[in-house]
């Protein structure tokens, strides 16, 4: 039995070695991000214990075939060197792949405050852009290097283990007596069964889920225990399940009825266009000389970065000044946490459906929005982006849905491209200004949408710009704010400026400071600033969201239009609540409460909003039923439109 147990010893040694490496990756994440911990009393050790549990699932997935092959072969007395070397190659290849999400998870979590998931596959269609982002952002280099160091050390240890056990396999063959052979097969069956049980992760009706990692009130520690490869694998499998391709939060009929009621839509429901209605503004004051419109979507500009909202560093003097001299919104929220969500919500009044990209598809989706309505009024519509036009299917989507001209990296000098996301904000805005000036000379009204991207890794700050802060992450915010101010200063000298309404907002926020709940508020709380002719200077303290931009803007412009969106004119109708998404979570909130729901976990998180704006978790879920109904209804109605009205 000696050779058999040596084979078993080899398998167990590799398994333990793999668990050790995955724990090291978790330790790196803990060291790098431990400042995110808000529950001082929560056990740190338990996160690592939970982590080994989840790591073991991945290790068992990889080990089940080698365990079966090697132990069966050893049971029959056959342990050839070639077999061991083949198994070693198997382990090296698959664990090298499994370690990748663990290495990438630290910077990913730092940016998104959630573990790496299937949403990253949306980046795979842009290999050059994605690889450029990874290689050009210096803060990622450490984790790339650690991946190669840890993986290299693992493979080196594998080779040493193989050589050690190869020598032991030179021992005389095990006795092939029937009883001993049967005994070895029984032990093999137990080990294979143990491996399969490790894949399942737990006893009971359901296999292990991410919810098993939750043990305290701290969101970072709860997620620290989840193996990134496990999270990536299960989220991808969830995407492929038929029942998860279509959201089933509540019956469609109930959701549509509720949503129409909240939006003030009356009359019979048209199943082919459930939210269609005619919006009639005051035609008596409708201007014959329609104002131009400039919409600026700022990358990751969380409200928490503004001094107006309490940031102690002087990062955004331009936005802070505009905020106090414009129509500004205090409690305004993004539809999601990705740029494509911000664009479809702001420009087309359609909410985010968790992590789906609603602009992509073999057949380009059709939407009615700001550009399509303005086109009916004779506007020329332009869209400016820093990167390639094909990114996220932008060129096809926007040209299909109301935009006449798309300006992108393909239009700019190659010498101005600074990273994988194209040109810097100031160059893009300078190019946009020159183009707008030419367009204005035609005498036709225009709409220009400018999407910035500088406040997204890799951060590139022009040499001429001299920031006041020391950290690159805050310096880039200073630069982005300056670029807006420089654009507006130069635009103010142009004849078209006085007849132009400007809309400035973020596409979404980002993590600023610590998260006091399951989802950082700073990720969706964003500024919205509107100014121009006929726009009142006031601070709007009610609730608002990106889908409200279109009806609010058209209300200010006194335009009549056919509307199919989820928004309301905030100057005429107050929202009792808002709702939004964050990849695998959906949220509803009002001024006093915040409700977060994770459909894959079927778990709710309920928070009271404290006077200082922070969140405090509460277990009194019954008090949040109206918020739950609000977000479930709106998301389910959006799901219906996405599936039945395209």
Tell where the protein language model's regions lie, with residue ranges.
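Short alpha-helical "patches" and their helix-cap loops
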Residues: 81-82, 243-254, 359-363, 567-568
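The feature marks either
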Residues: 126, 214, 218, 225-230, ...
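Transmembrane and membrane-interface helices of multi-pass
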Residues: 2-244
């Amino acid at each position: 039995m000696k050779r058999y147990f040596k084979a078993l010893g080899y398998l167990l040694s590799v398994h333990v070695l793999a668990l050790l490496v995955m724990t090291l990756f978790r330790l790196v994440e803990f060291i790098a991000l431990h400042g995110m911990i808000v529950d001082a009393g929560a056990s740190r050790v338990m996160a690592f214990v939970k982590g080994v549990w989840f790591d073991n699932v991945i290790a068992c997935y990889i080990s089940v075939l080698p365990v079966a092959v090697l132990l069966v072969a050893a049971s029959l007395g056959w342990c050839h060197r070639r077999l061991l070397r083949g198994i070693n190659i198997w382990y090296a290849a698959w664990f090298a792949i499994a370690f990748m999400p663990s290495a990438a998870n630290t910077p990913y979590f730092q940016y998104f405050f959630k573990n790496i998931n299937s949403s990253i596959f949306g980046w795979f269609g842009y290999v050059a852009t994605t690889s450029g982002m990874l290689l050009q952002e210096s803060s990622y280099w450490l984790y790339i290097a650690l991946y190669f160091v840890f993986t290299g050390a693992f493979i080196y240890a594998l080779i040493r283990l193989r050589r050690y056990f190869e020598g032991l396999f030179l021992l005389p063959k095990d006795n092939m007596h029937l009883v001993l052979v049967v005994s070895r097969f029984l032990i093999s069956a137990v080990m294979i069964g143990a491996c399969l049980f490790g894949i399942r992760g737990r006893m009971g009706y359901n296999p292990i889920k991410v919810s098993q990692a939750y043990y305290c009130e701290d969101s970072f520690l709860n997620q620290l225990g989840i193996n990134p490869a496990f999270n990536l694998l299960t989220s991808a499998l969830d995407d492929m399940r038929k029942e998860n391709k279509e959201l089933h939060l509540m019956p469609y009929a109930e959701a549509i009825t509720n949503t129409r009621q909240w939006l003030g839509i009356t009359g019979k429901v048209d199943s082919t266009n459930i939210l269609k209605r005619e919006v009639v503004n005051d035609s008596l004051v409708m201007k014959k000389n329609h104002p131009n419109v400039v919409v600026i979507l700022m990358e990751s500009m969380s409200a928490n970065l503004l001094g107006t909202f309490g940031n102690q560093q002087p990062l955004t003097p331009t936005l802070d000044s505009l905020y106090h001299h414009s129509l500004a919104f205090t409690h305004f929220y993004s539809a999601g946490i990705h740029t494509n969500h911000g664009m479809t919500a702001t420009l087309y009044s359609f909410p985010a459906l968790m992590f789906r990209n609603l602009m992509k598809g073999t057949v380009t989706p059709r939407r009615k929005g700001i550009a399509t309505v303005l086109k009916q009024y004779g506007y020329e519509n332009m869209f400016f982006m820093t990167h390639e036009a094909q990114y996220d299917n932008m060129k096809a989507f926007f040209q299909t849905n109301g935009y006449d001209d798309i300006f992108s990296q393909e239009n700019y000098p190659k010498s101005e491209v600074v990273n994988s996301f194209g040109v810097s904000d100031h160059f893009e805005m300078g190019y946009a200004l020159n183009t707008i000036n030419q367009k204005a000379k035609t005498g036709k009204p225009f709409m220009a949408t400018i999407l910035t991207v500088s406040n997204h890794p890799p951060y590139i700050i022009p040499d001429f710009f001299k920031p006041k802060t020391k950290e690159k992450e805050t310096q880039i915010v200073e630069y982005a704010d300056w670029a807006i101010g420089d654009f507006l200063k130069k635009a103010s000298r142009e004849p078209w400026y006085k007849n132009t309404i400007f809309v400035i907002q973020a596409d979404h926020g980002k993590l600023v400071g610590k998260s006091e709940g399951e989802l950082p508020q700073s990720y969706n709380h964003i500024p919205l600033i509107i100014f121009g002719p006929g726009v009142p200077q006031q601070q709007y303290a009610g609730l608002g969201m990106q889908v409200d931009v279109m009806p609010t803007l058209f209300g200010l412009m006194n335009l009549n239009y056919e509307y199919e969106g989820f928004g309301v004119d905030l100057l005429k109708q107050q929202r009792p609540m808002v709702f939004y998404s964050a990849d695998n979570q959906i949220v509803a909130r009002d001024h006093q409460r915040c409700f977060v729901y994770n459909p894959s976990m079927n778990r709710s998180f309920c928070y009271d909003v404290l006077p200082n704006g922070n969140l405090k978790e509460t277990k009194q879920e019954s008090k949040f039923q109206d918020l739950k109904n609000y977000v479930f209804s709106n998301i389910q109605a959006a799901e219906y439109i996405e599936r039945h009205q395209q």
